[in-house]
Amino acid sequence: MNLEKLRARKGFICDMDGVIYLGSQLLPGVREFVSWLNENDKQFLFLTNSSERSPKELQQKLQRMGLDIGEEHFYTSALATAAFLKKQAPGCTAFVIGAPGLLNALYDVGVTMNDVDPDYVIVGETASYNYEVITKAVRLVLNGARLIATNSDLTGPTEFGIAPACRSLVAPVELATGRKAYFMGKPNPLMMRTGLHLLGVHSEEAAMVGDRMDTDVIAGMESGLATVLVLSGCTSRTDVNGYPYRPTYILNGVGEIVTG
């Protein structure tokens, strides 16, 4: 496989889980890939559908793994959700099922927490998900709150195996209310447009690197980027055959961008 055209791209948008790390384990070839990005003056952005951590926390997580990357290189679905609400409904209220990364992003744009009569019910990943909060969310949506989810990932990779992700968590609320959530993360074009804007490059000059066909690859393809599927996360080569579209490149991991 000739990777010269890929290496010539000016900008790289990379997913994190299953691409850069699995849980707390850095994946093989990542150090070399990040060094290559820096040495070749590439513009790069880690664009994650996870809403649990802030850019600062993601920076610190990679720092603990031995990678020193500036906070400006991270953008999350929590930030995308906050930016959407700031533009669509400034000063709105919300009942939030989510981790501090989501809550803080919403606070920062002036969203007020409200568990009585909120404008929105917002669902992200959290370890505190339980029957009580599902029931509360269902009742609020039935009473008129609009339903938003930070991303459409059904599952996500961890060092222990596959874990349920945001779409799995919001599904009971959708089923119980008959309302469909609006999903903010990849492949939502708003997320990709923001990523390209932060990179400062045009779509034809950039590549999207991810481990999911249904979010990363389709997001890149529909936004006009070259797409790189890495098999280090939750997608196998066989899985690709189940989709009507194909990535531009299929690699075992990001290290092959440098060495392949």
Regions found by a protein language model. Give the residues of each.
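Asp-based, Mg2+/Mn2+-dependent phosphohydrolase catalytic module
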Residues: 2-42, 53-75, 82-260
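Conserved phosphate/oxyanion-binding catalytic-loop motifs
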Residues: 50
